[in-house]
Amino acid sequence: MQKGIKFRIYPNREQKNFIHQTLRCCRFIYNRGLAMRKEGYENGEKIGYSQTSAMLTELKKQEEFAVLKAADSIALQQSLRDLDRGFVNFFQKRASYPTFKSKHNRFQSYRTVNQKDNIRIVGRYIKLPKLGFVKIRQSMEVEKINHVIIEHTPAGKYFAVLNVDFEPEPRSNAGGTIGIDVGIKAFYSDSNGNTVSNPRYLERSMRKLIREQRRLSRKQKDSHNREKQRIRVAGVYEKVTNQRNDFLQKQSTMLV
């Protein structure tokens, strides 16, 4: 089995510039491939991954698109594979028609694949294609990395989501059942008489988020102070999301 492990990374200024350049290139290639496939779909012409990949190769030969040659080539190919997967899901009625990616989306990411051990953790750093060694806050050991998703969040933080193989630990099945009643005052009560309260730290974070959102609404539009406040709101929102997910994960694990 595979799982994703998320670590925060701390790229330097040069590495940040490269990450954002790769994000722009991946978005451009994805949108270019989508436009190509959309036109072919409307004209009854079958265009798949191989045709969009050939389009990328031709663009790299043109001086106008020289920036594509400097970006992570694996990440560019992966963006086209994501597009192809989107069309497969659409035709199998598992998803809606793929849409163009906007540069105004605050959350951006790209995926790169481990080839010939070009992605690995060495000490307090992770080696990434074209980026070199990037400082990482590693909270657990990992073995072979299959691929990595580099994320830039609305709060201005950078993360590396590592896809790794793992063997799940077998769990004993007691064979029992339990009833759960989700409430408002308490998070839930079960049929054994146990009650789990809503976490107070999450309530405090929610109140802080509301305060910061009110401050944001009072800032002048397009001002520097508004952008600073937007990042502050995004940071609090990210904290609330992480706290909620951590709480739910712990409760579900305890019940199982």
Residue ranges and their predicted role:
Residues 1-256:
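Nucleic-acid substrate recognition interfaces
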